[in-house]
Swiss-Prot record:
This protein's name: Putative hydrolase YdeN
EC class: hydrolase
Organism name: Bacillus subtilis (strain 168)
UniProt GO molecular function: hydrolase activity
EC number assigned by the record: 3.-.-.-
Family statement: Belongs to the RBBP9 family.
Pfam families xref list: Ser_hydrolase
Catalytic residues identified in the record: 71 (charge relay system), 137 (charge relay system), 164 (charge relay system)
Keywords: Hydrolase
Classification via InterPro entries: AB_hydrolase_fold, Hydrolase_RBBP9/YdeN, RBBP9
Amino acid sequence: MTKQVYIIHGYRASSTNHWFPWLKKRLLADGVQADILNMPNPLQPRLEDWLDTLSLYQHTLHENTYLVAHSLGCPAILRFLEHLQLRKQLGGIILVSGFAKSLPTLQMLDEFTQGSFDHQKIIESAKHRAVIASKDDQIVPFSFSKDLAQQIDAALYEVQHGGHFLEDEGFTSLPIVYDVLTSYFSKETR
């Protein structure tokens, strides 16, 4: 079955921002089916709306599906996976600047992280799990991403100077995401 990647953006972003178009283009060139989802109302996001959007793709998910999320997209897919009834594990999830608790500077997003997450269900939902975090992220503290990686038993990839991996910080490509994905792909073909 063909590898499939869904890229989920974060708060105040869209499918045309940051490193998302680069990753999609790179994956398509490799013959991987790749889509960047446009999440509703990214300037004033509501969890229910984002879960409804993710649910539209639920029937397309399979063992060769990988979810790549950035920032607010991370708790959104974690909530999605908590409630999803999968017949088989997804191939994997990669969470860039991921978090699973309230951000002190963005409390208007607390709806996405209120209450505890079902870490075991999330672990069981995806064969491979990775968190990519920057030591100098001013939006999502590195410790939040590190905690998330521990909670969901994910590999943690530390970047020294990545900020929040935004376009205005110079990130129109993010090779580490591509490299982690392709390492997972190669594990599946052995």
